Amino acid sequence: MTITPQNLIALLPLLIVGLTVVVVMLSIAWRRNHFLNATLSVIGLNAALVSLWFVGQAGAMDVTPLMRVDGFAMLYTGLVLLASLATCTFAYPWLEGYNDNKDEFYLLVLIAALGGILLANANHLASLFLGIELISLPLFGLVGYAFRQKRSLEASIKYTILSAAASSFLLFGMALVYAQSGDLSFVALGKNLGDGMLNEPLLLAGFGMMIVGLGFKLSLVPFHLWTPDVYQGAPAPVSTFLATASKIAIFGVVMRLFLYAPVGDSEAIRVVLAIIAFASIIFGNLMALSQTNIKRLLGYSSISHLGYLLVALIALQTGEMSMEAVGGYLAGYLFSSLGAFGVVSLMSSPYRGPDADSLFSYRGLFWHRPILAAVMTVMMLSLAGIPMTLGFIGKFYVLAVGVQAHLWWLVGAVVVGSAIGLYYYLRVAVSLYLHAPEQPGRDAPSNWQYSAGGIVVLISALLVLVLGVWPQPLISIVRLAMPLM
C-alpha cells in the first residue's frame, strides 16, 4: 500500500515522538547533558501534542490495516502525551540528585510513550501486542532505575517476570482467537464472530487468556499482586507513568476492541468481567485501608479505579454513554493521579535514596508548605469522588451507565467501594493538617511552585477544581471522539 501525505499527517504524533527518540539517542552519544536531553524530550512531546490539531484536520482514516486514526485515537494519544510530559517534568529535579546516568531515563519514557500512542491507534491484535510490549519493555528499566536501592531492583525483577508471563498468556490467547476466526483485525473479528460463534470453546479459551494478559497490565484482581510492590519500589516519577499513561493506553485499546468485536455479547465473558470488576473494587479499597505508605496506598487505589472503569466497559453494548463515561473518568483519574504523584515526586526530589512515601512524611505539611498541602487535599478529594471535583464527574457517569445497563450489583459495589475509599483518602488529607513532628524527615524545596514540576501540579489541581464545577469543556472533547469511530 502507498502512504499518502494525508496518511503522514495522521501519523504525526507517532512520527514526532519516534524522531525525538532518535534525536535524544544521538544527543546522548554526542555529549551527556542532562538539561539538554530533558529539554529535547519535552519539546518533542509538546510538538506531538500540538500536532494533534493537524491530525484532527485530516479526519478519520485507516492509515494501515494495523492502525486507525480517529477522534478516539486522538483523545487517548493526548492523554498519554500529557502523562509522559508530566513524568519528564517530575523526573528532572529528582534526577538532579542522581549520581548515575540520568539521560537514559528520558529515552525510556519516550519509547514507552511511543508504545502508548501505538495502542491508542491500534485496530488489530498485532498492533495491540506490539504497543503493549513497546510500553512494557522500557518500564522494566524505569522501575529499576534507582538500581542501588534493593527495593527498586526487586520491583523491576518482579514486574519483568510477571509481565513476561502475562504477555505469553496474551499472545497464546490471540493465537486461539485467530485459529477460530481466521483474522486479527478488530473490524474483521466483529464480522466473523457472528451469533453463536462466541460460545465456541476455543474462542472462549482465547478471550479468557487475553483477559488474563490484559488483566495483569491493568492490575485487576486477581492479577494485581505486583502493583503495590512495584509502585512502592519504583521512583516516584516512574510510578506516575505506571499509574497514568500505561493504564490509559491499554484501557483505550481494550475499549476499541470491545466496540468493534462483540466480545461483550458473550454471557460467559460478561460474567467473568463482572466478577473481576467487583473483586477489584472491593479488594483494592479494603487493602488500601491499612496502608501507611502513600505509594502503596495509591497502588491499591488504582486497582479499584480500574474496577470502576470495567463497569463502564461491561455496559458498553447499552449505548454511547459508556464511551463518554470512560473518557471522562480517565481524564479525571489522569489529572488527580498526576497531582498526587507530583506531590510525592516534589517531596522526594532531588534523589536522596528512598522516596518520601511514608504517610508520616506528610504529617503537618500544611504548616510549612500550605499550598502543597492544599493541592494534595484536592487530589485526595477528587480520587475519592467528592462533588465539586473532576473525580466526582467520572464516578457519577460510571454510576449512571451501570444503572442504565441494570448492573445493580456492580452499582452497589461502586457505592460501597467509594464509601470505603473515602476513609483512607481522608486519612491522608487529615494527616496534612496535624501538628508537624519536631524533626520532619523529607520536605519539598521552598520555591517548589516556581519549578516546572510545581507548575504541572498546580495546573492539575486547577483543572480538577474547574472541570469539577464546569465539566462541559471536557465532556465536549470526549464527545468529539465518538462520532469518528
Swiss-Prot record:
Transmembrane helix is among the record's keywords: yes
Reactions the enzyme catalyzes: a quinone + NADH + 5 H(+)(in) = a quinol + NAD(+) + 4 H(+)(out)
Enzyme Commission number: 7.1.1.-
Record-level GO cellular component terms: plasma membrane
Keyword Protein biosynthesis attributed: no
Chief location: membrane
Cell location: Cell inner membrane
Alphabetized UniProt keyword annotations: Cell inner membrane, Cell membrane, Membrane, NAD, Quinone, Translocase, Transmembrane, Transmembrane helix, Transport, Ubiquinone
A single BP term in Gene Ontology: ATP synthesis coupled electron transport
GO molecular function ontology, one term from the record: NADH:ubiquinone reductase (non-electrogenic) activity
Domain of life: Bacteria
Membrane association type: Multi-pass membrane protein
EC class name: translocase
Subunit relationships: NDH-1 is composed of 13 different subunits. Subunits NuoA, H, J, K, L, M, N constitute the membrane sector of the complex.
Role noted for this protein: NDH-1 shuttles electrons from NADH, via FMN and iron-sulfur (Fe-S) centers, to quinones in the respiratory chain. The immediate electron acceptor for the enzyme in this species is believed to be ubiquinone. Couples the redox reaction to proton translocation (for every two electrons transferred, four hydrogen ions are translocated across the cytoplasmic membrane), and thus conserves the redox energy in a proton gradient.
Record-given protein name: NADH-quinone oxidoreductase subunit N
Species this chain originates from: Shigella boydii serotype 18 (strain CDC 3083-94 / BS512)
